[in-house]
Structure formats: C-alpha cells, structure tokens
C-alpha cells in the first residue's frame, strides 16, 4: 500500500536559505550574480575586493562585477580578442582613501586645537583672549587660503595695458609681425662699422664708486644738467650726412628698441618716414619713448593707478631721474674732459659747458648686404683711463630698487654684497627688455664697458631720496651672452623690418607694439599726422582768431 514519506524540512529562523551547505556544493567558489546579468564566462574570480572589510557592501553592489572582460558571441567575429585578467578599476573611495584619511586627521587635529583654545585653565584679560583668538584665526585663514589657491590656482588677473598711441580709424595696417616669427630671424652678414664723425666731450669715471658697498652707501645727488634726446630727423649731423651717403638713418635707442622687441611687454611706437629711397626711423614728439620702464617683464608687474607712488608711469619717471643723476655723479665733474674732434652738435653757443651732461656722439655706418647703408648715432656716457694710459669708453646705466616685497624681489641691502648674482638674476627676470636694450646700445656704440649702478630708495615710501649701494662692470659682448641676447637674431629682426619698410610707398608710417599681444604692426599714416608744423599752424590760427575777436 502506498505510503507518504514526509520530507526533511530545514528550519532557518534567522534567514531565508538553508541552514547548512550540501556536501556537493561545499568549497565551491561563488560570485554574487543577478538573474538579469548576461553570462559571458564560465567562471570569474577577479572581482575587486575592499581592503577595509567594513565597507565591503556599503558603497557598491557586486552583482555584475565580473563582466568587464566577458565574451558575448555575436555575428561579428572580428571583435573577438584575447584579454588578460587585469585588475578592475578602483572605486572613488579606494583612489582617495589616503586623502580622506589625512583630511579627517587634520580636521580632528584642528578640532582638538580649538577645544584646547576654548578651555580656560587660567584667567586671562579680555585683551589677551582677543589677541590669542585673532592670532589663531589668522593662522587658520592663512592655511585655508594656501589650500584654496593650490586647489583653484587662482591668480590675480592682469589689467589690460594701454597703447602708447591711440590707433585711429583712418590708419591702415600694412604689415603684421608676430614675435615667434621674429625670434627665428638670423642675419650674420654684418660688416664691421665705420666711424664717420665723432662729437662731444666726456668726463672721466670716478673709480671711488667701485668701492661702494651696502655698509658705506652713498646718497644720490640731484644734478641739474641738460640731456639732449634729439630724434633722427632733427639731428643736424644726420641731415648733412643724408645728402651724400646712407639710405637708412636712426639712433641707437630706436634701433635697440627694434632689435630687442621680442622681449618687450608694454606698448611702444616708432615713426618711419620714407623719402625717395631713404628711410628715417624717428620717435614721436612728447612721447614716453625715453622713459625707462620698471619691472616690465615681471610675472606680476606694478599695476597701481593714478598718482600712486608705485604706478607704472611714476616708477618710470623715478627710474629715468635716477639714471640721469647717477650717470653724472659717478664721473669726475668739473675736471678735464676727453674731447672728440667735433663739438656737441646740440649745444647752443651761450650755454656753459658745465651745464651740459657728459655725453659723446659717434656716428657709425654699417653695410647690411649690398643694398642697405645704415647710419646710426650712438652714445658714450664716460671714459676710463687704464693703468697704461689706454682710454676705454663706457656706458653708465642704473638699476633701481623700489620695493623688494613686490615682483619676487630681493632685499638689496641684505643680498647685494654676498649674493650679487641672485640680485642680477632677479633684475634680469623683471627687466629683461631694459637690460637687453642697454646692452645692445653699448655694442652698437663700441663701448668697452657697461657700468651698472645699484640705487635704492632711502625709504620704501619715499621716491624722492635715494642711495647708491654698489656698482658692477661688464663687457657688453660677454654680458649679452649672459643674458641670452643674440646679436645675430637682433640684426635679423632689424633687417626684416627694414626690408618691409623699403617695400612701402613714399610717406609716413608707424610701427606699433600691440599692448596686449606679442605682435608689432606697421600702419600707414595720413598726411600731417604727428606733424609739429601742423600743430604750430593750428596754434597760430587760434591766436589770430582770438586777436580778431578782441578787435571786434
């Protein structure tokens, strides 16, 4: 007779599955899966595991974790590839686990510090407690500010620079040259210069200035002497020479501006006049061309506005004032002068010699190939006599310290004597364009030495009093190598600019450095632009109109 046998039922009061694993399934590897997952491998035990067992099932599901390299058979057999069992990608927590731990430790430390600060073990005055609170607050703000700057890489935005001259709507762009292209220019076919005419008289350098240190600094004197900054077309000697020789005329300062233009940051402009087959490079009347820039090439140049002590224009005026005074104070003023064959062409007859600055002009001629005959007016600032009586011409320039807290500056009073190389390296970084121009002018003039004076403010907030902290002497060609100034590239840039201007029609043009881009442009100017004669005629007409109104 049939009999019903009751099956053995396993009661699991704490779960839904069986209480024990059957013998045939014991020790069998198992990976969690879902019925919705597609099967792509026979077995896969390469799934990622957490090092910290507390978070094994907290942040992610393990279902489908072994399907990264699963093979699914499809009709396109070309997609089949063999893969190795590499590690799967770590989760966000695993990647940042160490950083999270450090942040938690730092937060706990700050919390303990605050707790200790809030505990009043000893009675303190109200002022002392406020002082401690402010000190701790500044410490936390400083730490937080550094982390915020590192994370966000926030930097002060530089203000857009102004153009040296306003570009009018009727000016037409004839040519545009970018600095990367100019930096690749090379010209080596430069013949040795020929001296055509030498004018002026020079005072001798006072070697006592070579012994100045930061311990025995010397006050900078205000010397009232006349400095002539005459442009090319107003030079009577160049006008005379242009009738018989040469087809390109300029001054050393104008040429140095063009030859070193790839280092410039601020805007500048040069007027080019083509008369027949001759080119004249001029500077604009009443422009800032002769002002010396300060920290122009620094990462964060001065950006104060208005009448601020450290505004770019006030700093340029201060640097020019210092340079003029030091270039005369370091000479033996009132002594016998070294005279060239011809007198200074810019000195009037009724002017005393002591009122004129010590300067000599050397008019030199270069042949750039077969078609360019270049005549340049170069300058010397002084003369030195060697032990054997040999004469050496020098150019004297000045570097000035305005505030060492800005532009990654170095305190000259502490570092100039012991680490002069570091001071010069900082100045080369902040004033690369200015130093390159000075070096280029000294090479063009044929000066044997370039004298650099280090002048600082007597007080950081006083721009009217200065002290001389030291001097340094270089040979121009050697100094050019130190500052990475390639004269082959400089001559290549000049030759390129001359060739472009010679292709233009007769007229007046303007070479303008873009204030915010590494580009120089050549503009054609309408007749009468920047003409001093036109301004004088307008003034005369205004005066005549006023006289007629008074008569009526």
Curated annotation (Swiss-Prot):
Q: Where is the composition biased (Acidic residues)?
A: 532-552
Keywords, in A-Z order:
Cytoplasm, Initiation factor, Protein biosynthesis, RNA-binding
Q: What does UniProt say about this protein's domains?
A: The RNA gate region regulates mRNA cap recognition to prevent promiscuous mRNA-binding before assembly of eif3d into the full eukaryotic translation initiation factor 3 (eIF-3) complex.
Localization (cell) = Cytoplasm
> Can you cite a GO biological process for this protein?
cap-dependent translational initiation
Which residue stretches belong to region RNA gate?
A: 288-302
This protein is called Eukaryotic translation initiation factor 3 subunit D
Region called Disordered, residue ranges: 525-552
Q: Name one Pfam family in it.
A: eIF-3_zeta
Identify the InterPro entries for this entry: eIF3d (IPR007783)
Native organism: Danio rerio (Zebrafish)
Q: Its function? A: mRNA cap-binding component of the eukaryotic translation initiation factor 3 (eIF-3) complex, which is involved in protein synthesis of a specialized repertoire of mRNAs and, together with other initiation factors, stimulates binding of mRNA and methionyl-tRNAi to the 40S ribosome. The eIF-3 complex specifically targets and initiates translation of a subset of mRNAs involved in cell proliferation. In the eIF-3 complex, eif3d specifically recognizes and binds the 7-methylguanosine cap of a subset of mRNAs.
Taken from the UniProt entry, a GO cellular component term is: eukaryotic translation initiation factor 3 complex
Q: Name one GO molecular function term.
A: translation initiation factor activity
